[in-house]
Swiss-Prot record:
Formation of pseudouridine at positions 38, 39 and 40 in the anticodon stem and loop of transfer RNAs. Its EC number is 5.4.99.12. The gene is truA. SUPFAM superfamilies: Pseudouridine synthase. Pfam families: PseudoU_synth_1. This is tRNA pseudouridine synthase A.
Length: 257
């Protein structure tokens, strides 16, 4: 029987999920054996809380984690039926975080609403060379929220194609800055123009969940280790950001800027 494994990882440590010597999949293969399928092929720099891979082996998660490199954790496992396809999820949930530089949040919400629904998203997809890749998919929800100096965008959909969320995030932010209007996004949806939209930086994106309606057996030790890792890394980045802010404020006091 095939088995699904829940995987969390720091995407900044790897060159994407697959297709490169330093991608994540070879590391997973060394610990789990042959990979029969995956939930999402995340880009270089994109982290995940709950991606999945499928194998034919049921291994103890303590053993699996002992074989994984720093920044990767297998924290759940579930048996699935023969013929199960991990690409066919009920929903995928991603979070994109960007600095707030005064963007109009209401304009961003209006832009996000345009992108919700079942559409041909060719304007927001980078093809991987396979021109047969479907470009029609369903986005269930996009939420935009400002919290202090940051913009949080939550994307929920059946499936997202290559670079799709990062391109939608760029377009929503551009609308908040007045570079685009919601009507421009509507035009891109109704009359697709492949290559028309750039991608927002990968480091702002995290895969939060892939919903299969399946209950996973959870290995809590790995969850706690992953939580501690991300919290410590956040604190280190927060300290670095505070130092940069202090440097900028010192320059301002010197009337350099």
């Amino acid at each position: 029987m095939p088995y699904l494994y829940r995987i969390a990882y720091d995407g900044t440590l790897f060159y994407g999920f697959t297709g490169h010597p330093n991608s994540l999949e070879p590391k997973l293969r060394a610990a789990l054996g042959e990979i029969l399928g995956r939930g999402s092929r995340t880009d270089p720099g994109v982290s995940a809380v709950a991606n999945v891979v499928m194998t034919s082996q049921r291994l103890h998660l303590g053993y699996v984690n002992s074989k994984l490199p720093r920044g990767v954790w297998a924290w759940g496992v579930a048996e699935v039926p023969e013929g199960f396809n991990p690409r066919r999820a009920k929903a995928r949930r991603y979070l994109y975080v960007a600095p707030h530089w005064g963007e109009d949040v209401e304009a961003m919400r209006e832009a996000a609403a345009v992108l919700v629904g079942t559409h041909d998203y060719s304007s927001f997809i980078k093809r991987r060379g396979d021109k047969a890749t479907p470009t029609v998919t369903t986005v269930y929800k996009i939420e935009v929220e400002q919290r202090g100096g940051l913009i949080y965008m939550m994307f929920v959909g059946r499936g997202f194609r290559n670079k799709m969320i990062r391109k939608m995030a760029w377009a929503i932010l551009a609308t908040g800055r007045g570079v685009l209007k919601a009507s421009d996004l509507r035009e891109l949806v109704e009359r697709p123009r492949p290559g028309a939209v750039p991608s927002a930086p990968a480091e702002g994106l995290v895969l939060l969940d892939i919903d299969y309606g399946i209950e996973f057996e959870v290995y809590h030790t790995a969850l706690r280790e992953a939580y501690t890792y991300f919290l410590r890394k956040y604190r280190a980045v927060e300290a670095h950001a505070a130092a940069l802010k202090a440097a900028g404020e010192a320059l301002a006091r010197l009337d350099v800027v």
